C-alpha cells in the first residue's frame, strides 16, 4: 500500500468540526457512566471508523446521532471482542503478578467488579511503569489492541459478532500490509504511553488530596475529587481511542471491505 500518514489524516478528520472539543467532552462524560456508557462509546467509535473505512471524509457526528444504533454496534463490538479481551486481561494479570507480589481478587457483585477493574488497571499502570518490561509490554498491548479494533470493525461491517473471531481473515489483512499495521501500532503505543503518564500523575495528585482530606465528609468535595481525577483521564483516553479507531479505519480502506453499508452514524 502507498504510505499513508495515518496520524495526521485521522487528526484532520477529527478536527474538521470546529467544535470537536465538545465531542470529546461529550464522550468523556459518557465514559463516567459504567458499562452502559462504555458500550455506547465503543459503538460510536466503531460506527465512525466504519464510515472512514468506507472512504467517507468527515468528523464524528455531534448532532443527530442515532443513539440506539451506536449502542447496538457497541453490543456487537463487545460480543465480537469479549474472548480477545479475556486473553488480553489474562496477559496483563500475568504481567502484574510478575512485577508485584500483591494478589488480585475481584469482587463478585457488579459494582465490585467495576471497582476491581479500575484498581487492576491502576495497579498495572503504576507498578509496571516502574519495571524494565513496561515498554515491551506496552508494545505487545498496542499490537493486540489494534487487532481487536480490526475485529470490531469486521463485526460492524458484517453486522455479526462472529466476524470478529475470524482470526485467519484478520491476520491475512495484517500480512498484506504489515508495515501500515506496525505504523499504526507504534503511534498507538506512544499515545498509550502518554495516557499512562497522565493517569499516573493524576492518581498521585488524587492520592495526596485524599490524604489531606481524611476526616472530611463533605459530599461536594468528594464529587469534586472524583471529577478532578476521572474526567481528565476520560478525556485523554477518549481522544486516544478515537484517534486509534480512525487510523484503523483509514488502514482498512485499502481492503475495500466496508462497502457503503451505513452512510450515517
Protein language model features and the residues they cover:
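Long, highly hydrophobic alpha-helical transmembrane signal-anchor segments
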Residues: 1-24, 57, 62-66, 70-135
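Interfacial aromatic "cap" segments that immediately flank transmembrane helices
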Residues: 2-31, 64-87, 145-198, 245-246, ...
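Selective recognition of hydrophobic, aromatic-rich stretches within alpha-helical transmembrane segments
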Residues: 31-54, 85, 95, 121-165, ...
Amino acid at each position: 500500500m502507498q504510505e499513508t500518514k495515518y496520524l495526521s489524516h485521522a487528526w484532520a478528520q477529527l478536527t474538521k468540526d470546529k467544535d470537536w472539543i465538545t465531542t470529546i467532552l461529550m464522550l468523556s462524560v459518557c465514559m463516567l457512566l459504567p458499562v452502559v456508557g462504555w458500550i455506547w462509546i465503543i459503538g460510536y467509535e466503531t460506527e465512525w471508523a466504519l464510515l472512514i473505512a468506507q472512504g467517507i471524509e468527515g468528523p464524528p457526528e455531534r448532532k443527530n446521532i442515532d443513539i440506539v444504533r451506536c449502542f447496538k454496534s457497541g453490543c456487537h463490538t463487545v460480543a465480537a471482542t469479549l474472548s480477545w479481551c479475556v486473553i488480553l486481561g489474562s496477559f496483563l494479570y500475568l504481567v502484574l503478578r510478575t512485577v508485584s507480589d500483591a494478589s488480585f481478587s475481584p469482587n463478585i457483585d457488579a459494582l465490585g467488579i467495576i471497582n476491581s477493574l479500575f484498581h487492576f488497571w491502576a495497579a498495572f499502570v503504576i507498578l509496571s511503569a516502574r519495571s524494565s518490561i513496561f515498554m515491551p509490554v506496552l508494545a505487545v498491548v498496542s499490537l493486540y489492541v489494534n487487532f481487536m479494533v480490526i475485529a470490531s470493525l469486521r463485526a460492524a461491517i458484517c453486522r455479526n459478532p462472529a466476524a470478529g473471531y475470524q482470526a485467519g481473515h484478520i491476520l491475512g489483512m495484517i500480512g498484506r500490509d504489515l508495515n501500515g499495521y506496525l505504523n499504526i501500532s507504534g503511534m498507538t503505543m506512544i499515545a498509550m504511553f502518554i495516557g499512562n503518564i497522565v493517569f499516573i500523575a493524576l492518581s498521585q495528585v488524587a492520592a495526596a488530596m485524599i490524604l489531606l482530606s481524611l476526616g472530611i465528609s463533605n459530599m461536594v468535595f468528594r464529587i469534586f475529587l472524583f471529577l478532578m481525577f476521572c474526567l481528565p483521564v476520560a478525556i485523554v483516553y477518549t481522544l486516544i481511542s478515537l484517534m486509534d479507531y480512525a487510523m484503523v479505519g483509514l488502514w482498512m480502506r485499502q481492503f475495500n471491505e466496508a462497502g457503503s453499508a451505513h452512510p450515517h452514524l
